[in-house]
């Protein structure tokens, strides 16, 4: 096999013409491009099996069709973990499972682990750094077996369920250095399990030495273990992300939501 980053028809034709011995084509593709893969393969004349070797929600590089999710300073509005869950399940059911008789051998969900590269380090990854599983793991179990796990991950239904100073992420929140602010998240647990809250603030496009999500900036949040918090904005002008992880500690399940904001 060989792997393509998209299902570009001309690239597929080149493979057919120059590497006819390849018997399985692998395609890495993300929403919204996944639905077009089969048609592109057929248009190019590919008649052998194929695999979707990466799939997931819309990538950080694919935001032009959703301009409201690109903030004036370049920050990107991220889906909640529950919104991502819905995207993973829809992608598999509508574009992978249904094509098993059209040559699709299967798929690899991106990312089975936690993210260690990329523009936004919470964008992908079905596990957090503690090893807790996000709702997308539940969705994939359902996609693969027809049954959800006995215990489900916490739910943060939409981006409207995390607010900073009463505003949602798309409102392009700008605050002054050292200003006082507040935030809250609305989360539920399908099984009624107790939930814990873990808030953090990080500067945009920073990472730990291994490329993963860094520890939050200390000294800003009064108490980061509540569903409603008060915090001081960083003293340094720049762009930041406010992140909350909501955990069912007993069952090692987690949900997340993010609000970008700018200090000016």
Walk through the language-model features, giving the residues of each:
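Aromatic- and acid-rich polysaccharide-binding/catalytic face
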Residues: 8-61, 65-68
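Substrate-binding clefts and catalytic carboxylate motifs of secreted carbohydrate-active enzymes
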Residues: 42-209, 224
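Exposed beta-strand face motif in extracellular beta-rich ectodomains
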Residues: 181, 238-242
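Surface-exposed, flexible coil segments in extracellular/virion-facing regions
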Residues: 203-231
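Short, surface-exposed loop/turn segments at beta-strand-coil junctions that are enriched for proline
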Residues: 232-238, 251
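Extracellular and select intracellular beta-sandwich modules with Ser/Thr-enriched
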Residues: 253-259
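Short beta-strand edge segments in extracellular beta-sheet folds
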Residues: 260-264
């Amino acid at each position: 096999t060989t792997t393509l980053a998209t299902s570009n028809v001309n690239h597929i034709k080149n493979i057919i013409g120059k590497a006819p011995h390849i018997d399985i084509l692998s395609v890495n593709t993300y929403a919204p491009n996944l639905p077009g893969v089969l048609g592109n393969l057929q248009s190019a004349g590919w008649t052998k099996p194929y695999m979707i070797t990466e799939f997931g929600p819309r990538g950080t590089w694919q935001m032009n069709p959703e301009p409201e999710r690109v903030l004036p300073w370049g920050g990107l509005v991220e889906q909640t973990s529950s919104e991502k869950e819905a995207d993973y399940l829809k992608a598999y059911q509508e574009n992978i499972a249904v094509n098993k008789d059209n040559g699709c051998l299967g798929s690899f969900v991106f990312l089975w682990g936690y993210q260690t590269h990329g523009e936004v380090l919470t964008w992908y990854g079905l596990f957090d750094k503690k090893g807790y599983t996000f709702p997308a793991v539940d969705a994939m179990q359902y996609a693969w077996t027809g049954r959800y796990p006995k215990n489900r991950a916490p739910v943060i239904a939409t981006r409207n369920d995390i607010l900073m100073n009463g505003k949602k992420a798309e409102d392009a929140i700008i605050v002054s250095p050292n200003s006082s602010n507040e935030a809250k998240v609305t989360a539920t647990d399908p099984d009624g399990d107790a939930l814990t809250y873990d808030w953090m603030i990080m500067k945009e496009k920073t990472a730990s030495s291994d490329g993963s999500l860094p520890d939050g900036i200390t000294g800003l949040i009064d108490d980061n273990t509540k569903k409603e918090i008060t915090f001081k904005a960083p003293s340094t002008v720049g762009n930041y992300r406010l992140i909350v992880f909501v955990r069912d500690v007993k069952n090692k399940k987690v949900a997340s939501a993010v609000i970008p904001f700018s200090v000016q």
